[in-house]
Amino acid sequence: MKKLLLTLAAGIVLCSCGSHDPQIAIVPYPNHLETGRGTYRVTDRPVTCDSRTDERTQRAVVGFAARLATVTGGTNPVTVADEVPASGISFVTDESLPAEGYELNVDGEGIEVRASQFPGFLYALQSLEQLLPAAVYGTEPAPDAAWEVPCVKIADAPRFAYRGMHLDVARHFFSVDEVKRYIDVMAIHKLNTLHWHLTDDQGWRIEIKRYPELTAVGSIRKATVVRKEWGTYDGTPYGGFYTQDEIRDVVKYAADRGVTVIPEIDLPGHMLAALTAYPELGCTGGPYEVWGRWGVADDVLCPGREKTFEFLEGVLTEVMELFPSEYIHIGGDECPK
């Protein structure tokens, strides 16, 4: 997992390189940035949200202030007010800015963040944290770090509406905590969409109450192929799945970090895990087995059976209830005739 996160972060950094101010290490680099003289020290500074900021923005600001207080060893009290002071760290609603845009201004008197909606405030916070020492991402006090922000004027907004990452948990299962860490890395880099690949031939990872065998049987494969030696298996059962409560928890966690989760239920191919649990959904009746290898399996959902469509309606209905995303991904690829 650590290697995956480091690779993800390194790849994003490399893709964002350019002829920018080497003193400013914000990823992705802002659309407009002016550097000034001097710095502003953030230790023991009051934090103010104007009263027009929404609840999610205020929660994000409170979280930022708490993390800041932890690593600096100081205090950063948060208040909500109709008028924000000229000094300290302030968050001001500016409806002239786009939904995901923000302005971040730092001078000797304080830090002012302006945005119109939650995403803009969130991305401003990410940029602000990247202007601070790396210890800001820690959980222990770092009093010897230089807790100062360079004086800058930033105006930024994303170029692309969809900025996503894909996570396949069917072939390799990730715990809830690992998925959350993945989301954290996405949020740091202002990515806003997680494509969560929850089912495949190698395992079914989401609880469907109407079809309990999907996880009781379909979440576990007997063994996994060793690298590309197709005839050699490790002999170790492998599995795991997420309960619906865990799914809700991840979806909320992601939403609080500006990330929408799009679930993928791959169909009509890539369905060996489901066929193993419910063989009557296949064209041959089986026997089927959760796949322990990679590639494209010949066995798929049978479109000539009414039960297949009842199954899909039941599964997708529960999935829609769990994910507020506008979209559900249904795969549709690599389906042998």
Where are these regions (language model features)?
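Feature activates predominantly on carbohydrate-active enzymes
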Residues: 97-309, 313-329
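Positively charged n-region of N-terminal signal peptides that target proteins for export
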Residues: 1-4, 261
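Short acidic (Asp/Glu) and glycine-rich catalytic loops that position anionic groups and cofactors
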Residues: 15, 43-44, 291-296
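Acidic, contiguous N-terminal accessory segments
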Residues: 17-161
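Hydrophobic h-region of N-terminal signal peptides that target proteins for export
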Residues: 6-17
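N-terminal leader/propeptide and maturation segments of large enzyme subunits in energy/redox metabolism
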Residues: 333-336
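Intrinsic disorder/low-complexity segments
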Residues: 10-11, 82, 87, 241
